[in-house]
């Protein structure tokens, strides 16, 4: 019995690489698949939140969706100012902001109520599968953790962004959280031992460490923290055109296979290098999701086993 089976018992080993688990989700934008009549050709600049712009995978997905919808006109994706996540989402929420047009963040019922979500997990749902970035001297604290009760008893503190839904998810599961509003500062706080684990998504952690270039930071090798946490593209509540364009573009990419190619290109390496299938899974509940996103998230967790088998080949 693998570590995964031991910890997850009821999870069924069924998966189709990140596409079929959500390509039939009902859209909040319309009653069915959005259709586009012939549009007057225009050109538009789309300001993408700087953290997403700096992520090759997220920027590539946004550009893929825009490329698939040429009837909307030419486009250019521009890097936003260095806004905190909270500031970027506030700018989107108020609408008509010139500072940011698109942001990819973890979803929550509250976020979906004040912005338009494009309801496709951009990384196939991998954001909800998290590993710990740690200092080497902290590794013994993780050695005997086999389940959530062990994790709580270890008194390991997890660092997270103050505006991230993850902080509330972890807290709701009885895990102590230390937070800061700036992502970059959290790495410094880890080095100063303000907490023991900086939990980062499987889809982002290798890129994070490549950018940090800090030999004092390592990835804890045995644990995988898992909870339903779909990561969506969000736009302002009054920007229906961008929402429809992004959704239509992603749907077209799913149906022509280029979305699968995108996932393979940007995320297969992480699954292989992080040895996810052999890790002990610490399964958490996420009380923050809307009913729709809860269904998406749980489907993703239930399909984890086959996801890992496919991507690790």
Feature-to-residue mapping (PLM):
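A ligand-binding cleft/hinge motif common to bilobed small-molecule-binding domains
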Residues: 93-94, 101-114, 197-217, 224
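Short loop->beta-strand "edge-of-pocket" segments that line small-molecule binding or catalytic clefts
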Residues: 38-53, 144-163, 196-197
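Ligand-binding cleft/hinge of the Venus flytrap
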Residues: 62-76, 145-152, 161-182, 209-214
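Short helices/loops that flank or line small-molecule/ion binding pockets
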Residues: 78-100, 172, 184-203
